[in-house]
Each structure stands twice: as structure tokens, then as C-alpha cells.
């Protein structure tokens, strides 16, 4: 849900400076999640709205524009550890966006005014994928790279060579760099997510994220299995293929054997552009691949040169972004769930509808204020959109369709899980259960503690946590480390192998660095980033527990609100006792990332899993050595695992690694690699 922006004319200089700084940070964080982690935090239209607001403010207050502002840099990912850097011979620019036909008309008028005449345009579908540059020398594919930050990308040559639609040899022995989009066809995306769910893995949010995550793999075998495809649409060296227009370039690309999208169209009027947009707005779901808009390009290449570009975008092209796709549905119920911090969140349960290629029947209503502001009632007909193919959201209530006897929805006053009275804390919009013994909160806290981004205890998901709670085998996070084999074997569907795997994952989690433990404790307002910043500063959990609000708030990126939350947490008797019990269990409470890591190490940046019994030392020692050399040691095998080190009696993890095509080493191979690294690194 977008905030109401203050009109620019009503802003003081100080207010503008503060809002610009906030927007720059927010958009940077969104960009990191989208480009680097392939896990977007918000829908595209929300990002676009914040970005447009930042552009407007920076235009009005140029003294606050900074070199690292998202408006001054090409969107893209930083280079992933383990992938070589590639310097682009010419910058890989982003496209400017417009979101209405009126804005597109304004762009056309500016372009016409600059050129002095009405230009011919080439229209292309905006493929929802990952930008890539392909370099051919004498007709042979020698390098492929991602956009990265626009100047430096990642070398993904080996991965791209597994994509069948990209030729390794052109039909002519020419030397050229071309650019295009790697995407995942809808059918491949559906198959991949079905398999991931069967394997107990989290499905990808959308085909774009799946394509990005698949291309940026260190394990080429994984990329090959993902069935990616590509379209080529640009070269910075048109003379190499003897063309003078964008449409001519597409024809030459096809003649060279390169994959091109054949839906492009050369037009001359805005009416033609409107018709093209209308045509593919209605047809987008029938295409075999995802599109999120239409790209309008000046067709004559010499006119493109005349128009030039800014530091970030070309002036000769613009992307029209499709509005969020909408569907009509009926709200049948409103359910309330309790989170780990006690926040009670409403969710609308609706008649299932097809939206952006998936079936949707639930949408978060966020908090009581949101629910009241929209006046959503059971039985209402509502519009539903899923912009960016990510988060379903109710748009508006169709009041004309509301049943005559439809009553205002009553906000609950008691917790749906423990039936304690709900409260509104000062300054919060959330409805909250403050009962520390609420079973729903305890379940969510334990599930969070074991989650991948916290202590990463593989095999301890919501179902297992629920079983353990019902059996009274665990009560808090410390009790996880007191679990016994006999207890686990008494649970439904637990066999000897699964028990061994879970106990092994619990043991492995003891060696995690402090920031994971701090995040796993589930302190209100302390996310993964804040946990890392605090851990870096104080080094030990006890030092954090002893710190004052002023000490913690002095950390860049940590405000007084977060600092107060941390101090209040560690003042409680329960937290003090928990620290003692975690220490007694042997859980590391020290920040481990002060080791100076050699970024040239083979292990740097790789996700590695250890399994089985090691003869030349313990798994804990091996884990510490790998972490000191920049590896991320995890407890479970997934498609993102780079290497499995298998000792004696390796079990299901080895089977899964082989099934996923993950590289597997025995202990001797690991020892030899350690020797090559040198003991002084």
C-alpha cells in the first residue's frame, strides 16, 4: 500500500532533504533484494512509485542529489562472489519508465521537439527477465555477462552456453557484442516450482526471479536443468552488421542465428503505439513468456545518436509499464493470524481467481486501520491485483455490488490463538497479543529461530515445530538444543535417518556467527541487517545485553527505536536466563566474521554443506575453517548449494546433491583443497 505523499510545494527544505535520504535508502534496499538476492521485497508498482517520487524531489532540490542515489546509477546486481568480473566495453543502461499513455505522449513530444521532426518508432515487447551481453569473436561465443551495475557485470559464459536458444557459433564469422534478455518460459517456471515444492524448497516468486537465480549459479549443471531461453535486441556496434535502423538490427540478428522476438512493429504515430499497447495488454497471458510492458525505440540509429543518453538511461527509448492486472472476486471470510512478535494480522479469504498466471484466493489486509479504511466486509465484491506477479492486494470495494444486509466487520478484541485480550501499543497500527505464553507466538518464534536466514536448522519447519510443541519437547529456543533421539523417534513420520539429520543440523547451528543468533532471537524490529550491524559492533551476545540505548543507537543504520527494543528485550528475566542456557548448550555467542578473508580463495562466497563422518577432524572444525575462508556453511542441500563435502556414511544429503547436480567432494578432495589454500591464509 502506497503512502500519501506530501505535495512538493508544501515541503520545507529540511523536510525534502529528509525524505530524499529516506527514499534513496529504501530504493537501494529494494534494489539489493531484487537484483542481488533475486527476492523482491515489494511489487514493481510500489518501487516505481517511490522512484518517481525521488526523481521529482531531486529535480526540485538538486542540492541533495548524491552520486550513489538510485537515480544516478544503473539498476542491477553487484558481482556475486565466485563469479568473475567483466568490464562492459559500453555501459549497459537501464530504460526510463512511464506508466500511462499521457506520459508516453509527453515523451514522444519531447523526442519530436529535440529531433525537429516526428520520428519513426520500433515497438518491442518488454521481456521480464535478466539483461545479458554476449560477445562473439569470429562468430564464436567467447563471453557472456550480466548487467551488474551497468559498468561491471558477472561472467556467466559457462551458464549461458547451456541455453539452447543461444548459438555458440553464428552463421557468419563476425566479431560483435550483442545484448538481450535471459528469461524463463512460463512452462519451465511451472515445472521448476512444482519440483521445488515437492523437494520441500521455497518456490520462486515469479519467472524473472527464477531466471536470475538460475543464470547466476556457480554450478552450471543447475542452470542447464532450468531450461532458460533468450531474446537478443541490441548492439552498441551496428556497423559490424551493416544496419542503420533498430528494426534492421533485429532482422540481422535473426539472420545470424540469434534468437529474436518476432512481435516487434515499426510505426509512425501515437495512435499506432496505443493500438499496439492495447493489443498486447490483452494478449500477454497467451504468450509463452512473461512481459511487463512495451519498449518504444527511435528506429533510425543516427537519430538515436542525436538524442544521446543520461548517466543512467537512453533518451531514444522508453518503457511503457503495464498497469497491475486486476480480477474481480468475492471476500468470503477474514482470518486473523498471530505472528512471532504478537502482531495479529487479518487476511482476506476470497473466491479463487486466476491472476498473473496463478490461482489466488488470499490477500493480506495488513492491520485493522487498513481494513477499516477500505471498509472491506465479508460478502463484498473487490478488485484484486498482483503487480509484479508477487503480492496479491485488494484494490477497491465495488460498493454497487455490496449486499444490502452487509454489516461492518467487527475487529476482534481477543487473540484467536490464546484468547488473551488484544491491545494497541502506543504509536502502532498493529493489533497485538502481549501474552508471552501465547502458543501461536511461541510456534512462530521457534520456526523463525530455525529458519534459513537465522540458525538454519534444516528439517525444523513449521510442521516439526508444531509436533515438538504439542509433545512438550520444546518450550523455547534453548530447549531445541536439549532434544534427545528417543524424543524425536516417538514423533509421527520420524525415522532414524530423519532424526539423525535433524540432530546433526541442530549441532551444526551451534557454530553459527553471532548475527544469525541475534536475528534468530526474534527481537522486535531487529531484522537480519540490523542484527549484523549490532553483532559487528559489540562482538559478543553478552556485550549486546549489557549495552545502553545510546551505545546501540550510535551504530550507523540503527536508530533509537531499534536500540530501545534491544535493550528492553535483554532486560527481561527470560532473556537473561536464555543467554545462560544457550551458553550451557554450547551455542556460539561470538561474532565470527573478523577474520580477514582472502577473496581469491576457492571457497570464498560458496554455499557449502558438510555431511557424514570426517576422519581427519570434526565437522565443527571443518565448518570453522570454511567460514574463515569465506564460505557460507549451511545445514541443507538445495539448488543454491555450490559444494557438498561428504564423509563416511553420508546419507540423504548426498542423494539430494546428486539429484540436483551439486558438486560433491569426498574428504580427501577437501584435504587436498585445504593444502592448496595454505595454512597461513
From Swiss-Prot:
Active-site residue list: 126 (n6-amp-lysine intermediate)
Keyword NAD assigned: yes
EC number(s) from the headed UniProt entry: 6.5.1.2
Biological process per Gene Ontology, one example term: DNA replication
DNA damage listed as a keyword: yes
Co-factor(s): Mg(2+); Mn(2+)
Entry GO MF terms: DNA binding; DNA ligase (NAD+) activity; metal ion binding
UniProt keyword list: DNA damage, DNA repair, DNA replication, Ligase, Magnesium, Manganese, Metal-binding, NAD, Zinc
Reaction(s) catalysed (UniProt annotation): NAD(+) + (deoxyribonucleotide)n-3'-hydroxyl + 5'-phospho-(deoxyribonucleotide)m = (deoxyribonucleotide)n+m + AMP + beta-nicotinamide D-nucleotide
Domain BRCT: 598-681
Chain residues that bind NAD(+): 44-48, 94-95, 124, 147, 181, 297, 321
Record InterPro entries: BRCT_dom, BRCT_dom_sf, DisA/LigA_HHH, DNA_ligase, DNA_ligase_AS, DNA_ligase_CS, DNAligase_adenylation, DNAligase_N
Top-rank taxon: Bacteria
One GO location term (cellular component): cytosol
Binding site for Zn(2+): 415, 418, 433, 438
Function: DNA ligase that catalyzes the formation of phosphodiester linkages between 5'-phosphoryl and 3'-hydroxyl groups in double-stranded DNA using NAD as a coenzyme and as the energy source for the reaction. It is essential for DNA replication and repair of damaged DNA.
PANTHER family, per the entry: CHROMOSOME TRANSMISSION FIDELITY FACTOR 18, DNA LIGASE
NCBIfam families noted in UniProt: dnlj (TIGR00575), PRK07956.1 (NF005932)
Family membership noted in the UniProt record: Belongs to the NAD-dependent DNA ligase family. LigA subfamily.
Name of this chain's protein: DNA ligase
Lineage: Bacteria, Bacillati, Bacillota, Bacilli, Lactobacillales
